[in-house]
C-alpha cells in the first residue's frame, strides 16, 4: 500500500490522473495508517540495532554480521560514509571512541555537504540531526585528513576491533506514511487534514505541537519536502 500510494500520487501529479488517482492514493495510505504500526517516542530508537523489528518499520532491508563482506557492495558501502580506516589509531589516541567517530574499512568517499548539514541543523530542537549526521571541528583534524562531516545513521556495530555493517535499512517507515497522507490531503485541498498529519511527524522531531501553521498549498508541500529531506 505504501508503493501504491506513491504510484497514484505520482500519477495524479505528473500524469494527469486527477482526483481519481488521488482518491486511490488516499485509500491506500489510510490502509497503512490503520494497519497497527506506531511511531516510536524517540527518533533515535528507530535505528537502534537492538530494536530493529520495531513498530514503526513497515518494510526494511535486513543485514546481519558477516552477511556480505565483498568490498564496495551492500551493506559494506556504508563504510564510504565514515571516517577513514587509516585514522582509527590516531582518533583513539586523541581520545575519541568508535561511537563518537566511527571509522569504516577504507577512505571516506562520501561527505554530506555543509549546506545539507546546515539545513538539518536549522532548528536546534530537531532531535533527528545528531542521529543522522555529525559535524566536527575538533583537535583531531589535520591538513592531511579533514574529518568534518559524516553520515552515522547506519554505522552498524563495533566488536572485536571490527566494524560490521549490520544496520537494517528502512525502505518504508510509518513517519513516511504520515507525510504521504499529508501530501495527498494537501493535493485534495484538505488543509486541516494535511497539517494534522504533517505535524504528527514534526511533533516528535521538535517536541512542539502544531509546528507547521502556514495553510497555503505551496507552503504545506514545501514543509513536507523539508521533513522528507
Task: Go through the PLM ranges and name each one.
Residues 1-75, 121-229:
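Acidic/polar-rich alpha-helix caps and helix-coil junctions
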Residues 6, 88, 105, 112-115, ...:
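Acidic, low-complexity intrinsically disordered regions
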Residues 52, 82-86, 101, 114, ...:
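Short linear sequence elements within intrinsically disordered, low-complexity coil regions
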Residues 66-96:
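Acidic-aromatic pocket-rim loops
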Residues 90-133:
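A short, charged
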Amino acid at each position: 500500500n505504501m508503493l501504491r500510494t506513491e504510484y497514484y500520487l505520482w500519477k495524479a501529479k505528473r500524469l494527469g490522473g486527477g482526483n481519481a488517482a488521488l482518491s486511490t492514493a488516499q485509500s491506500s495510505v489510510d490502509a497503512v495508517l490503520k494497519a497497527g504500526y506506531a511511531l516510536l517516542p524517540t527518533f533515535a530508537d528507530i535505528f537502534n540495532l537492538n530494536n530493529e523489528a520495531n513498530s514503526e518499520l513497515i518494510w526494511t532491508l535486513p543485514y546481519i554480521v558477516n552477511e556480505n563482506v565483498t568490498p564496495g557492495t551492500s551493506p559494506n558501502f556504508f563504510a564510504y560514509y565514515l571516517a577513514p580506516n587509516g585514522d582509527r589509531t590516531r582518533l583513539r589516541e586523541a581520545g575519541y571512541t568508535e561511537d563518537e567517530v566511527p571509522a569504516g574499512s577504507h577512505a571516506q568517499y562520501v561527505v554530506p555537504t555543509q549546506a545539507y548539514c546546515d539545513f538539518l541543523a536549522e532548528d536546534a530542537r530537531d532531535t533527528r540531526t545528531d542521529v543522522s549526521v555529525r559535524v566536527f571541528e575538533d583537535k583531531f583534524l589535520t591538513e592531511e585528513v579533514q574529518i568534518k562531516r559524516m553520515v552515522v545513521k547506519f554505522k552498524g556495530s563495533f566488536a572485536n576491533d571490527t566494524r560490521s555493517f549490520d544496520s537494517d535499512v528502512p525502505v518504508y517507515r510509518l513517519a513516511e506514511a504520515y507525510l504521504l497522507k499529508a501530501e495527498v490531503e494537501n493535493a485534495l485541498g484538505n488543509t486541516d487534514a494535511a497539517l494534522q498529519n504533517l505535524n504528527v511527524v514534526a511533533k516528535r522531531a521538535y517536541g512542539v505541537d502544531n509546528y507547521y501553521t502556514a495553510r497555503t498549498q505551496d507552503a504545506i508541500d514545501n514543509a513536507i519536502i523539508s521533513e522528507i529531506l
